[in-house]
Structure formats: structure tokens, C-alpha cells
Amino acid sequence: MRSKYIVIEGLEGAGKTTARNVVVETLEQLGIRDMVFTREPGGTQLAEKLRSLVLDIKSVGDEVITDKAEVLMFYAARVQLVETVIKPALANGTWVIGDRHDLSTQAYQGGGRGIDQHMLATLRDAVLGDFRPDLTLYLDVTPEVGLKRARARGELDRIEQESFDFFNRTRARYLELAAQDKSIHTIDATQPLEAVMDAIRTTVTHWVKELDA
């Protein structure tokens, strides 16, 4: 079976780390053990520096990061990760499990920030071409639930400190995009943890078995 790229998406506090662990466990039970893990922004030395710039509220002092500058930093980090880590791993037969990818930008910057969606799509296509994840698990939570969980973890980053309205717009865009793309599977992450884990196991298992069919 050809190696695949699986991405886990969702608002802050959606449970992406737990979901990743369930995905890994499920794939291993299906006989897939050669995997690497990525996060966005980040995953390379350059991309991690960009992550610090875009998420650390103190990284640029009092200077305000403009919405378009934010988008371009995300894409700079993304293309570096894709070209130097993800594509080589896939070519080597290694599965890639990612914490966020381009759907985050389409939702957060397109929905939350209100940046023109055509511009974002054009930028995506120019930077990534036709490269897309094979499977995306979108963990759907309300901002109220997600941010409560995120705040319980400790200090919030620059984006996590945005308003509920911002996250409501982001969630709405996530749901809109998920409804348009069959490769995106929505998981109700407001359920009890065991139910969420079961839904992830079932989705991944069925998807992998369909690949073998």
C-alpha cells in the first residue's frame, strides 16, 4: 500500500494530541508502523522559527502582525515542511501524521480573519500545487468547549487569545469546507472522550480497508 498523509484539524482544545495517539494506535493495529509526525506551523528548523514569530505574542514586541503577513508566514513554514519533510517521507514509503495543514489557514485566516477566500486558494495553489492530505480528521468543538480546555492547559498563544466571534467564524468555515470535501471527515469532539476515540478508530479503520479493497 502506498504511504499516505493523514492530518488532524480542529479549534484549540479540540483534542488533536489525543486524536493523533488514537490514529497511530489504529494504524499499528492495521500493520502500518513506519510513520513520522509533523506539526504546523513547525516541523523544521526554519518552520519552528516562523512558528515562534507568528504565535509568540512577545516575538515582535509592540509591532502588530498584519493579517497578510501572518498568512505568508504560515505558508512559508508550510512549504518548507512539505518540501523537506513530508514529500520525502511519503516518497520513502513512510506515512505522515500531521497536526494541522492548509485547512487551518483556510479556516482561521479565511474564516476567522475574513481574508478573501479566492486569494487564499490562489496562494495555496501557487505554493502547494495539487499536494493535499489523503485524509483529514476534523475534530469539531464549539469555541466555548475548546477554549475552556485550552485555557486549562496554561498560557495561551497569540491566536488562542482571539475572541469567541473569531473562533465562531473559524468553526463555521471549517464546517463549510468539510461539507465540500469527501477527504475531510468530521468527528464530534464534544462527545465523551471514549466516544470520540471510537469514532476516530472506526473512521481510520474503514478508510484504510477501503484503500486495500
UniProtKB/Swiss-Prot annotation:
The keyword Cell division does not apply. ATP binds at residues 10-17. Residues 147-159 are annotated as: LID. SUPFAM superfamilies: P-loop containing nucleoside triphosphate hydrolases. Coiled coil: none annotated. It catalyses: dTMP + ATP = dTDP + ADP. GO terms for cellular component: cytoplasm; cytosol. Its EC number is 2.7.4.9. Keywords: ATP-binding, Kinase, Nucleotide biosynthesis, Nucleotide-binding, Transferase. DTMP binds at residues 12, 74, 78, 100, 105, 108-109. One of its GO terms (molecular function) is dTMP kinase activity. GO terms for biological process: dTDP biosynthetic process; dTTP biosynthetic process; dUDP biosynthetic process; nucleobase-containing small molecule interconversion. The record marks 153 as: Transition state stabilizer. The keyword Isomerase does not apply. It comes from the Bacteria. Homodimer. Belongs to the thymidylate kinase family. HAMAP family: Thymidylate_kinase (MF_00165). NCBIfam families: DTMP_kinase. The LID domain is a solvent-exposed domain that closes over the site of phosphoryl transfer upon ATP binding. Catalyzes the reversible phosphorylation of deoxythymidine monophosphate (dTMP) to deoxythymidine diphosphate (dTDP), using ATP as its preferred phosphoryl donor. Situated at the junction of both de novo and salvage pathways of deoxythymidine triphosphate (dTTP) synthesis, is essential for DNA synthesis and cellular growth. This is Thymidylate kinase. It comes from Escherichia coli (strain K12). The gene is tmk.
